[in-house]
Amino acid sequence: MNYKYKTVLLKLSGEALKGDAEVYDKKCLEDIASQIIHLVKNGLKLGIVIGGGNIWRGKLGENIGMDAINADYMGMLATVMNGLALESTITKMGYDKIKVYSSLPIKTVTDDYNFKKARIKMNEGFISIFVGGTGYSYFTTDTNATIRAIEIGAEAILMAKNGVKGVYDKDPKQHKDAKFIKKISHQEIVDKQLRIMDLTAATLAKDANLKIEVFDMSGDNNIIKVLENKLESTIIE
């Protein structure tokens, strides 16, 4: 199968796993897993970073008086849970060439992150799920996704959004007159402070000349469609 990229980093939000459920929706997990399996079976080298927002938000920490550093680590642990949930779903659907790499050492259920090992395994057809954030507080999963994409030699980050087809000049959920942007530079994202991703991640991607493609994953097989160039999206480069 000819995809527009050979190696990509897929960035998923934690909310993508929950649907209308409280934490996880079986159908959402299976839909994402089936697309991932299809892609890697057809030759795509794929790394994945998942957020933890379906389980933990920093605001929850604030509400109970938790300091920001501990709250960040709880968010990192939430990404571990999400990575294991996706791994389990993919394995149950019959694809067992998969590794979960954690920046936080949890040897019982994950492998310690090592970009060289991840590259080797991806060349062997393994899916690599990167969890635990960067392993340090004050960094978002957007930043983690950008770092991992650079380290595995990805040609692009596929940034999956829920119900938003790409980048707009302002929040389309709050402003009916928001204008869709087909193509934009990393620097414009930073200068205009567009909240499609955090600015540290945008700056890192700019310095590494790493393309980011923002798309709406909520339609049928949209992860596959964006790689087949059959879906409207925003290119950041």
UniProtKB/Swiss-Prot annotation:
<dbReference type="GO" id="GO:0006225">
    <property type="term" value="P:UDP biosynthetic process"/>
</dbReference>
<feature type="binding site">
    <location>
        <position position="162"/>
    </location>
    <ligand>
        <name>ATP</name>
    </ligand>
</feature>
<comment type="similarity">
    <text>Belongs to the UMP kinase family.</text>
</comment>
<dbReference type="InterPro" id="IPR001048">
    <property type="entry name" value="Asp/Glu/Uridylate_kinase"/>
</dbReference>
<keyword id="KW-0547">Nucleotide-binding</keyword>
<feature type="binding site">
    <location>
        <position position="171"/>
    </location>
    <ligand>
        <name>ATP</name>
    </ligand>
</feature>
<feature type="binding site">
    <location>
        <position position="53"/>
    </location>
    <ligand>
        <name>ATP</name>
    </ligand>
</feature>
<feature type="binding site">
    <location>
        <begin position="134"/>
        <end position="141"/>
    </location>
    <ligand>
        <name>UMP</name>
    </ligand>
</feature>
<dbReference type="GO" id="GO:0044210">
    <property type="term" value="P:'de novo' CTP biosynthetic process"/>
</dbReference>
<dbReference type="InterPro" id="IPR036393">
    <property type="entry name" value="AceGlu_kinase-like_sf"/>
</dbReference>
<dbReference type="InterPro" id="IPR011817">
    <property type="entry name" value="Uridylate_kinase"/>
</dbReference>
<comment type="subunit">
    <text>Homohexamer.</text>
</comment>
<keyword id="KW-0963">Cytoplasm</keyword>
<keyword id="KW-0665">Pyrimidine biosynthesis</keyword>
<feature type="binding site">
    <location>
        <position position="52"/>
    </location>
    <ligand>
        <name>UMP</name>
    </ligand>
</feature>
<comment type="function">
    <text>Catalyzes the reversible phosphorylation of UMP to UDP.</text>
</comment>
<feature type="binding site">
    <location>
        <begin position="11"/>
        <end position="14"/>
    </location>
    <ligand>
        <name>ATP</name>
    </ligand>
</feature>
<comment type="pathway">
    <text>Pyrimidine metabolism; CTP biosynthesis via de novo pathway; UDP from UMP (UMPK route): step 1/1.</text>
</comment>
<feature type="binding site">
    <location>
        <position position="57"/>
    </location>
    <ligand>
        <name>ATP</name>
    </ligand>
</feature>
<keyword id="KW-0067">ATP-binding</keyword>
<keyword id="KW-0418">Kinase</keyword>
<dbReference type="Pfam" id="PF00696">
    <property type="entry name" value="AA_kinase"/>
</dbReference>
<feature type="binding site">
    <location>
        <position position="72"/>
    </location>
    <ligand>
        <name>UMP</name>
    </ligand>
</feature>
<protein>
    <recommendedName>
        <fullName>Uridylate kinase</fullName>
        <ecNumber>2.7.4.22</ecNumber>
    </recommendedName>
</protein>
<dbReference type="InterPro" id="IPR015963">
    <property type="entry name" value="Uridylate_kinase_bac"/>
</dbReference>
<dbReference type="GO" id="GO:0005524">
    <property type="term" value="F:ATP binding"/>
</dbReference>
<feature type="binding site">
    <location>
        <position position="168"/>
    </location>
    <ligand>
        <name>ATP</name>
    </ligand>
</feature>
<dbReference type="GO" id="GO:0033862">
    <property type="term" value="F:UMP kinase activity"/>
</dbReference>
<keyword id="KW-0808">Transferase</keyword>
<dbReference type="GO" id="GO:0005737">
    <property type="term" value="C:cytoplasm"/>
</dbReference>
